[in-house]
Amino acid sequence: MNVYGFNAKSITGEDTFLEDYKGKVILIVNTASKCGFTAQFEGLEKLYEKYKDQFVILGFPSNQFRGQDPGTNAEIQNFCLLNFGVSFPLFERVDVRGENSHPLFDYLTNAKPFKGFNLDDELESKFYNITKEEYPEFLDDDSIKWNFTKFLISKEGKVIERYDSWVTPEEIEKDIVKLL
């Protein structure tokens, strides 16, 4: 199986099939507009603009982590456009973990499980402590831990890599280029 079997509603409510992106490298990201990682939109947009002939970013807003994307779909779209010039495709807000998780995210997290926290890294250690305090049940599974988790997909629709929130778009660029 690959990601091409999934569909989702665009941020404007239109049915979108991931097979429409066949032949492009894809980066799927769960996003939020009120998160400490929200500034990553800038780096994501730069990557998209640089490689958009062969590459696409698909942004899926989620409100599951500290309620950091509470707006309507229109508000989310306007925020992304006005603050970061986001031109890559955005989708309706979805759950990315738990019993109401969008099937695409179930597939992605099964294909690339969570690698664990590197407690020697200051930022990862901080997120481990936040997770332990606020969402201890998250430590027991491979699901998404926070906003801006990213999944890199090959031109054939295969899940190649998972990058957690603290990995910046700039750090991912070399892996994207290898797949172009």
Language-model regions, residue ranges each:
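Thiol/selenol-based redox catalytic cores and closely related redox-interacting motifs
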Residues: 79-81, 85-167
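Conserved helix-turn-beta segment immediately C-terminal to the redox Cys motif
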Residues: 23-26, 33-34, 38-61, 66, ...
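Non-catalytic, surface beta->alpha helical segment in thiol-disulfide oxidoreductase systems
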Residues: 160-180
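N-terminal "domain-start" segment that seeds a small globular fold
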Residues: 1-19
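Thiol-based oxidoreductase modules, predominantly thioredoxin-like and allied folds used
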Residues: 54-72, 87-98
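Short loop/turn microsegments at loop-to-beta-strand junctions
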Residues: 3-4, 26, 147-149
